[in-house]
């Protein structure tokens, strides 16, 4: 994990720097990857809608929501600017080295066991699907001529931890 201060030291100046750089080079579109953590620590995050109340409870969620506001201010500073904000859940895929990759390694190595509620649903998605969704939403934004588009990205329905484990074991040939 990261120190709490690192989220603020990275996400807030990062947003400010990106917006300033975009102005300097006359870039008229920013795609910002935020997080569903802006909704708070709730198992219902997978069912949250884009207009759901944001109540981040972690430094990561707070810093990302603050960064969203910085990007929104950038967009509002010029009507020609376009902003696309995506709020993904846990993203997994090749070389991601996060929780899903650790779970795959543990299951394939036959040393995986559940330490929590197997029914907990994990909001998230595959990295290539996230990229495809961004391209789709850029086209949508252009077709509707919307200055700012914000959307959540998760599998629907969100699989449970047990669903993940069973699928990994099946694909990996582990019984």
Which residues fall in each region the model found?
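Short alpha-helix in the Rossmann-fold core of NAD(P)-dependent oxidoreductases
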Residues: 8-15, 31-34, 63-64, 123
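Catalytic helix-loop patch of NAD(P)-dependent Rossmann-fold dehydrogenases
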Residues: 9, 13, 43-92, 96, ...
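Conserved cofactor-binding/catalytic machinery of classical short-chain dehydrogenase/reductase
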Residues: 13-17, 29, 52, 66-67, ...
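Conserved Rossmann-fold NAD(P)-dependent oxidoreductase catalytic core, especially the SDR/UDP-sugar
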Residues: 16-59
